[in-house]
């Protein structure tokens, strides 16, 4: 995301959308009553027929829809301003926001949390492709902020089939991996697996892709369970420390350990977390995305809590539905805090 302009007087942010993550962030930030200015198209009656006419409109937001990995955010609302000749003011309309589009978001008042989220997203540039490889199977995935996208998950030919099969299988994996690297242009590649096959794949990858950094690590399997395992590792933090999906998994693991050994250093539930925040006791809070994407009083209460946490130098981690810890956190009320010190 690029922040092209921020007009403090109008409380208007002009943004250029560059990725699926950007669309997901806007889905969380946009609220009922906000205004957006964007290009769109609409069917307009012209005599006996109608045509889809491009135009720029001002839309008062009712709600948004985001579907993971579709490259589109749908913004529903009422048209507040549009070219007079079309006579569509007051009509319901949906803006389809895509990667590459520009949009102006106008709020009555941008809160610190939403502004910081925009700035953090604008600063975020790193991308990584993860390939888990074993002699008989492999998995290729790419993390986005809204979750992990599985690009490929396949079996390989048996080692007993013919001579030289290890080298052939390594070339097959490296070739497919190289295609995804060309498509997504990541900053780094992480190759991991239980045996030495990952080194064979790394050699092939380095021959095909000369200018990409390849990290190698061990993992118990080249499966989704292995993917969950690697997301908790320090190597992920080293490569992509700003991706909350990896950080969230590690923080949740820490919270579960504390609940087992020092339960007084963890609290969950909206009121309990709010009380801990007021006492300045919160080190880290994890919350599921649903709590910020609803249009109700609970969302407003949570936003105030998040602002208070940031003012007291606490850490905030949003957990999307696609995160491996989403349901675990949801079962604990959807919001959990790791504390700096014990409270009554």
UniProtKB/Swiss-Prot annotation:
Complexes and interactors: Monomer.
Record key words, sorted: Cytoplasm, Endonuclease, Hydrolase, Metal-binding, Nuclease
Entry annotated with the keyword rRNA-binding: no
SUPFAM superfamilies per the UniProt record, alphabetical: Dom34/Pelota N-terminal domain-like (SSF159065), L30e-like (SSF55315), Translational machinery components (SSF53137)
MF terms (GO), sorted A to Z: endonuclease activity; metal ion binding
First-tier enzyme category under EC: hydrolase
Coiled-coil intervals, chain numbering: none
Co-factor requirement: a divalent metal cation
Free-text domain note: The N-terminal domain has the RNA-binding Sm fold. It harbors the endoribonuclease activity.
GO CC annotations, alphabetized: cytoplasm
E.C. number(s) listed in UniProt: 3.1.-.-
Keyword NADP: no
Localisation per UniProt entry: Cytoplasm
Transmembrane segments: none
Name of the molecule in the record: Protein pelota homolog
Similarity field: Belongs to the eukaryotic release factor 1 family. Pelota subfamily.
Function recorded in the entry: May function in recognizing stalled ribosomes, interact with stem-loop structures in stalled mRNA molecules, and effect endonucleolytic cleavage of the mRNA. May play a role in the release non-functional ribosomes and degradation of damaged mRNAs. Has endoribonuclease activity.
Main subcellular location of this protein, as a coarse class: cytoplasm
Gene3D superfamilies linked: 3.30.1330.30, eRF1 domain 2, Pelota, domain A
Source organism of the structure: Saccharolobus islandicus (strain L.S.2.15 / Lassen #1) (Sulfolobus islandicus)
